[in-house]
Amino acid sequence: MSALTLTASKNTQTMTLDLPLLGSALALAAIGLIMVTSASVDFADDANGQALYYMWRHLTYLLAGVAVGFVILRLPLEWWHKQSWLLLVVALGFLVAVLIPGIGRTVNGSTRWISLGVINIQASEIAKVCLAIYTASYLVRRLDEVRGSWWGFAKPLLVLMLVALLLLMEPDFGALVVTMCAVVGMIFLSGVALSRFAALLMFCVGSVALLAVSQPYRLKRLTAYTDPWADQFDSGYQLTQALIAFGRGEWSGVGLGNSVQKLFYLPEAHTDFVFAIIAEELGLLGSLLIIVLFGVLLWRGMYVSRVAERAGQLFNAYAGYGVTLLLGGQALINLGVNTGLLPTKGLTLPLISYGGSSLIISCLCVAILLRIGSEAVSGEQTEDESPKVKNRGGAQR
């Protein structure tokens, strides 16, 4: 494993960080800062009279995310394991609080944010990480029950259904899909019987399909997705403008800062559709770079989780799988929406899009994966050294 080893001088504790994981995350964050600045300059100047308004806010959120990441790196994964019930309460607490009038903040018809003055906290961003950690803890504590009985298999799904209900009340269908994919993926990776997983998968797909057509605005988005040009000035407007951005970018792009679509043509150019601006300004080559960096990030996330599983650190492994699936699922959906492969959904691109809660939580997830990788390496080293200690003891006798 390509790694960077850090040593704390006071207690001589070492921490080994996975370099490809860390490097890909830093590269995505740096590109995100540049592209958010480029995509938001004209919008910020028109809305606030300050061209760099969103750049400074994004940089502040990024630094806050790095600070949170440093704290998370110092926390043993055992702490998360012990606090799993508390984290579930926190998740449910945020999802309930955002629905209380006067606490939740409504934007574009959705009540997803809790306003704390200078920052708006998106409840679903916190809830999905807490739920992934709780699910990892449950799988470790009840692994035989999950694998051996329908009731043990159903228990975490009941918690997921409660969270899903609260997310639908906001509504936040995108966060629901990402969270559901992560939890279902964690259950599959725990070794559950294939027949049960197939039944669960069919239930989830059916539920998502039913929810997608149950509300007029979701159905409208779905029909617009199939043929956005049929209603390019209404329901298909956002997607057609994104596709125009991709078409203008061609191979190498129109150049950094030279996007036309960000000039009030493409809504949410610095948030949900920043990838379309990347494609326009940096072209196909720049878009592929983003995809490759996400591929490296997700590969290393799954890799360090697998190493933890081989080292017998099951909670670390399942938590790593869950966090990686959260990042990967959200990135995949965002890229699919931007390219017209999936219906339009309000999800940010992790580590790149503007958004305080999303950026900080993404940094937290990366820090958790780095900590998992560090503990996994320590576990492997302990296993390798233990026979040698035993042999030395025998020689002394």
UniProtKB/Swiss-Prot annotation:
It is a multi-pass membrane protein. It comes from the Bacteria. It is found in: Cell inner membrane. Belongs to the SEDS family. FtsW subfamily. Its EC number is 2.4.99.28. GO terms for biological process: cell wall organization; FtsZ-dependent cytokinesis; peptidoglycan biosynthetic process; regulation of cell shape. Residues 1-18, 80-83, 134-148, 194-196, 294-316, 370-397 are cytoplasmic. The chain crosses the membrane at residues 19-39, 59-79, 84-104, 113-133, 149-169, 173-193, 197-217, 273-293, 317-337, 349-369. Residues 40-58, 105-112, 170-172, 218-272, 338-348 are periplasmic. Coiled coil: none annotated. This is Probable peptidoglycan glycosyltransferase FtsW. Disulfide bonds: none annotated. GO terms for molecular function: lipid-linked peptidoglycan transporter activity; peptidoglycan glycosyltransferase activity. Pathway: Cell wall biogenesis; peptidoglycan biosynthesis. It comes from Hahella chejuensis (strain KCTC 2396). The gene is ftsW. It catalyses: [GlcNAc-(1->4)-Mur2Ac(oyl-L-Ala-gamma-D-Glu-L-Lys-D-Ala-D-Ala)](n)-di-trans,octa-cis-undecaprenyl diphosphate + beta-D-GlcNAc-(1->4)-Mur2Ac(oyl-L-Ala-gamma-D-Glu-L-Lys-D-Ala-D-Ala)-di-trans,octa-cis-undecaprenyl diphosphate = [GlcNAc-(1->4)-Mur2Ac(oyl-L-Ala-gamma-D-Glu-L-Lys-D-Ala-D-Ala)](n+1)-di-trans,octa-cis-undecaprenyl diphosphate + di-trans,octa-cis-undecaprenyl diphosphate + H(+).
